[in-house]
Swiss-Prot record:
Name this polypeptide is given: Probable feruloyl esterase B
Gene Ontology MF terms in the entry: feruloyl esterase activity; metal ion binding; protein homodimerization activity
Catalytic center residues: S185 (acyl-ester intermediate), D397 (charge relay system), H437 (charge relay system)
Gene field: faeB
Lineage of the organism: Eukaryota, Fungi, Dikarya, Ascomycota, Pezizomycotina
Pfam families registered for this protein in UniProt: Tannase (PF07519)
The reaction(s) this protein catalyses: feruloyl-polysaccharide + H2O = ferulate + polysaccharide
């Protein structure tokens, strides 16, 4: 099936006839569902433009979503043990193209990513998503319940996929021809988990901004808090001052890539001297920092080492520090970090952040419950069955260091003894300059992995379309196109993001808004 069918539209005459048969099939579908461990909650026809009913969705997960296309929506519980279950949804679109896709979660999971379901359904994918086994972005449900933790660690996406595929085969006479995965952040970790643990689940996996080094990422939140101190510390750095620090880092590193565009193309080539911001007696404290504060900045922007001297987690991306200030540099331990230690590592509601030490980080890594770390570089089974892995990470990510994605790529290269040209056959990783966490940012970050980063003004910039073209037509992406949008939604410029290990350099002759004036070197 050609990729152009992703955007095909049914003829008006055929649509009316299809309406009755599609709605009837949906109305009768609940009576046909008989799948082990599945309790159907509802089956409903939803017309394009209709608001998605969320009566049974956890309140913290409710969001305003309008169906992008006509679809049959199935909500259900999937039992995973006698102490755990998943809330799941399957969206089965009228404009079905013979493709199935599973979506992932975010943060500490807890919510079905309905916007991702809607995005995939819009392009004719039968799609499924789960809540990861609990309600809301919290770790409290893991307390004294290892089964719920197992769902979050690895089980939820796989079980949801198994059920989603069965529903797809039941609903559509033709079944499905190809299966895909789409996820970012925690969803990126889940994508890598699938590649490593369930290599036969998908033909193509899109995993973005992945929290795959999960345990050490959690502990990194504590390290950053310790590095920057409490809010009442006389040398505490406010969010406003972090903005000043950010501007100085960009000033020092912007031209390293050859273009003065306000973007650090690749943080690996940035080596800012923070001490240049130390007050000299003629500047005030709102535009400069003290020597003690400079030391804190350098510590916060350095690698996180465990007690044995090994790197647990790489440094924060230069260029993302201003946004990180609202997460990691608040004077309190990052909430997800504190919850993980309280409800998982120590399994003790009385534990508090003041008790954290480097030994705590060591203990957390040794526990690695249900191998939640998705850092296993041996992905030969996925490669050998013909799977394709497309990964991306924003270089302005304030939550998860993009360097971690580079480290994993190198681990795979070493484990498989494979050169980049050999990895290119099945695994391609793209650095997205100016992208924040899974989107946003100051650069050409609209790469089309969801409604937040897709624009109909550039329909070819669509990660699902890119993956379909690679899996089904053998056309692998040489670069990742991304758009920078104006406030009114128009395209300001496009940039061709490089396939790692190459990086972008502005070589002209045009200015930085000309995509052909950049070279991957």
């Amino acid at each position: 099936m050609k990729v152009s069918s992703l955007l095909s539209v049914a003829l008006p005459g055929a649509a009316l006839a299809a309406t009755d048969s599609f709605q009837s099939r949906c109305n009768e579908f609940q009576n046909k569902i008989d799948i082990a461990n599945v309790t159907v909650r509802s089956v409903a026809y939803v017309a394009a433009g209709q608001n998605i009913s969320q009566a049974e969705v956890a309140s913290v997960c409710k969001a305003s979503v309008q169906a992008s296309v006509d679809l049959c929506r199935v909500t259900m519980n999937i039992s995973t043990s006698d102490r755990s279950h998943l809330w799941a949804e399957a969206w089965l679109p009228r404009n079905y193209t013979g493709r199935f896709v599973s979506t992932g979660n975010g943060g500490l999971a807890g919510c079905v990513q309905e916007t991702d379901l809607n995005f995939a359904a819009n392009f004719g994918f039968a799609t499924v998503g789960t809540n990861g086994g609990h309600d809301g972005d919290t770790a409290k449900y893991f307390l004294n319940n290892s089964e719920v933790l197992a769902d979050f660690a690895y089980r939820s996406v796989h079980e949801g996929t198994v059920v989603g595929k069965q529903l797809t085969q039941l609903f559509y006479d033709e079944g499905y021809n190809y299966s895909y995965y789409l996820g970012c952040s925690t969803g990126g970790r889940q994508g890598y988990q699938q590649v490593q643990r369930f290599p036969d689940d998908y033909d193509g996996v899109i995993a973005g901004s992945a929290a795959m080094n999960f345990i050490n990422l959690i502990s990194w939140g504590a390290f950053l808090w310790k590095a920057t101190g409490l809010a009442d510390d006389p040398d505490f750095i406010s969010a406003d001052l972090w903005s000043v620090i950010h501007q100085e880092i960009v000033r020092q590193c912007d031209l390293v890539d050859g273009a003065l565009d306000g973007i650090i193309e690749d943080p690996d080539f940035c080596a800012p001297v923070i001490e240049r911001l130390i007050c000299d007696g003629t500047t005030n404290g709102t535009s400069c920092i003290t020597g003690a504060q400079a030391a804190k900045v350098n510590r916060a922007l350095s690698d996180f080492y465990g007690p044995d001297g090994t790197v647990y987690y790489p440094r924060l991306n230069y260029g993302g520090e201003a946004d990180s200030a609202y997460l990691y540099f608040t004077g309190s331990m990052y909430s997800r970090t504190e919850e993980w230690y309280k409800y998982v590592v120590y399994n003790d509601t009385n534990w508090n952040s003041s008790q954290w030490t480097l030994e705590s980080a060591k203990l957390a890594l040794e526990q690695n419950p249900f191998n939640i770390q998705a850092f296993d570089p041996n992905i030969t089974a996925f490669r050998d069955r013909g799977g394709k892995l497309l990964s991306y990470h924003g270089t302005q990510d304030p939550i998860i260091s993009s360097t971690d994605s580079k480290l994993y790529y190198r681990r795979v290269a070493n484990a498989l003894n494979a050169a980049p040209s050999e990895l290119d056959e099945f695994y391609r990783f793209f650095q997205i300059s100016g992208m924040g966490h899974c989107g946003d940012g100051t650069g050409a970050s609209y790469i089309g992995q969801g409604y937040g980063t897709y624009t109909s003004k550039a329909p070819q910039v669509n990660l699902l379309r890119t993956m379909v073209d690679w899996v089904e037509n053998g056309k692998a992406p040489e670069y990742m196109p991304g758009n920078k949008l104006n406030a009114n939604g128009s395209i300001e410029y496009m940039r061709k993001h490089c396939r790692y290990p190459k990086h972008n350099v502005h070589t002209g002759p045009g200015n930085y808004t000309d995509p052909n004036s950049w070279t991957c070197v």
